[in-house]
UniProtKB/Swiss-Prot annotation:
C4-type zinc-finger residues: 57-72
Organism: Chromobacterium violaceum (strain ATCC 12472 / DSM 30191 / JCM 1249 / CCUG 213 / NBRC 12614 / NCIMB 9131 / NCTC 9757 / MK)
Pfam families linked to this entry: RecR_C, RecR_HhH, RecR_ZnF, Toprim_4
Span of domain Toprim: 80-175
Gene3D superfamilies: 3.40.1360.10, 6.10.250.240, RecR Domain 1 (1.10.8.420)
Family: Belongs to the RecR family.
Gene label: recR
Keywords from the named record: DNA damage, DNA recombination, DNA repair, Metal-binding, Zinc, Zinc-finger
Example GO molecular function: zinc ion binding
Domain of life: Bacteria
Name this polypeptide is given: Recombination protein RecR
Record carries keyword Zinc: yes
Amino acid sequence: MKNPPALEQLISALKVLPGVGPKTAQRMAFHLLQRDKQGADKLARALDRALTQLTHCQRCNTFSEAELCAICADETRRRDQLCIVEMPADLMMLEQAKCFDGLYFVLMGRISPLDNIGPKDLHLDKLLARALDGQVSEIVIATNFTAEGEVTSHMLSELFKERGLTVTRIARGMPVGGELEYVDLGTLAQAVYERRGV
């Protein structure tokens, strides 16, 4: 039996979410339509509101409802440090960790030749204008420790070093509360290589 076109359209729309395949999308669609119509309506309204009201912060490129996001508008933040992250979710993780009190720039991606994403797709003109505003003295690169994140980090470090800025990279290592026995070998090796004096 073939699904009605409206149901097929909903299933197809749900498949655009990361990690959602055809079966999961179908289960989600049936759940929303059968058991949670209020939830489905709430989801539709929230998505519509986000699509119409969210834009990109003029300075850091993260999502914002205003010209400047709350972080860029906060005058108490350090203006001499600029942390570069791949995605808005990365910025939020750093903020939740309360480990950085400078400003950010969100690339909205990373260099990934397999996905046809190159440097031109990472808002580098906007990033350069931000980094070279005369206030920033240190660039903190906080891209992910994947092959794509490493390539992006290398490209960014070269870009800023040749412009005379100090460039640092977040360290890799043992998770807090992690036990050596359960940590993967790459993480353990990196933690040993990047050890610090005590």
